């Protein structure tokens, strides 16, 4: 990848945020991505667009030729248990986690690449609902003993539900 492309949604989200820490993180993102590419032996490709609000997510190629995904995100509470949850699902309806790192204001995940056929947003809403319900049934499992996952009821209370 020549130069670093930033996803539009990430830029918009940071620009709307009054947190100077997030703006500093976005300014440091090119160096963060370079560090992760060196650390894990990756060649970065163009990020997925429009992207998310908290992370740079894009396809990468490992030195051994594997096609993976790098997710480098702003460190926030919702991201803290993402790798643990993916490992708990153990590739049953979720991608594999190959590596993770947390440093400064960054959480980084090296993930298996999942190449969908049709983006869900391109199908009628009733079909979207059916896919999501099927996936949720497939993903549900009891958390491991001693887990640190937040309880959904607590999240709902925190957002006023």
Residue ranges: model-predicted function:
Residues 46-51:
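Protein kinase glycine-rich loop
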């Amino acid at each position: 990848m020549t130069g670093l492309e930033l996803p539009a949604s990430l830029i918009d989200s940071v620009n709307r945020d009054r947190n100077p820490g997030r703006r500093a993180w976005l300014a440091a993102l090119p160096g963060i991505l370079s560090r992760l590419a060196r650390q894990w032996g990756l060649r970065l490709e163009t990020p997925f667009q429009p992207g998310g609000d908290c992370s740079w997510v894009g396809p990468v190629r490992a030195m051994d030729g594997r096609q993976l995904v790098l997710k480098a995100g702003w460190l926030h509470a919702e991201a803290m248990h993402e790798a643990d949850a993916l490992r708990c699902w153990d590739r049953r309806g979720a991608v594999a986690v190959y590596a993770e790192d947390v440093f400064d204001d960054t959480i980084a995940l090296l993930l298996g690449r999942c190449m969908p056929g049709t983006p869900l947003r391109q199908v009628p809403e009733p079909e979207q609902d059916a896919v999501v319900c099927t996936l949720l049934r497939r993903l549900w499992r009891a958390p491991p003993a001693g887990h640190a996952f937040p309880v959904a009821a607590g999240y709902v209370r925190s957002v006023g539900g």
